[in-house]
From Swiss-Prot:
Function of the protein: Antibacterial protein. Putative acid-stable proteinase inhibitor.
Gene Ontology biological process terms from the UniProt entry: antibacterial humoral response; innate immune response
Domain of life assignment: Eukaryota
InterPro entries: Elafin-like_sf, WAP_dom, WAP_four-disulfide_core
Cellular compartments per GO CC: extracellular space
Residue intervals of the WAP domain: 27-74
Signal peptide start and end residues: 1-23
Disulphide linkage map: 34-62, 41-66, 49-61, 55-70
GO molecular function annotation: serine-type endopeptidase inhibitor activity
Keywords: Antibiotic, Antimicrobial, Disulfide bond, Protease inhibitor, Secreted, Serine protease inhibitor, Signal
Naturally occurring in which organism (per UniProt): Pongo abelii
Location of this chain's protein in the cell: Secreted
Name of the protein this chain belongs to: WAP four-disulfide core domain protein 12
Length: 90
């Protein structure tokens, strides 16, 4: 293998690695949407998650009740939120 072929191979591998790492950093968003949150907060709680990948199963990382937490997503956001469902319980 010539030195120019080796250089092209190394540059290609570096680019593929950078693209893959960026995809992992951004994370894959899970299905569903975060429930409506109509709570006004004076102080935010410490985050329990940062991305959907931090949450187990189908749960999503959503800002709800003054902080980011893993919650069960809703299929679509209803006007006024889902008042009948307590989605913050594990």
């Amino acid at each position: 293998m010539g030195s120019s072929s080796f250089l092209v191979l190394m540059v290609s591998l570096a680019l593929v690695t950078l693209v893959a790492v960026e995809g992992v950093k951004k994370g894959i968003e899970k299905a569903g949407v975060c429930p409506a949150d109509n709570v006004r907060c004076f102080k935010s709680d410490p985050p329990q998650c940062h991305t959907d990948q931090d949450c187990l199963g189908e749960r999503k990382c959503c800002y709800l009740h003054c902080g980011f937490k893993c919650v069960i997503p809703v299929k679509e956001l209803e006007e006024g939120g889902n008042k009948d469902e307590d989605v913050s319980r594990p």
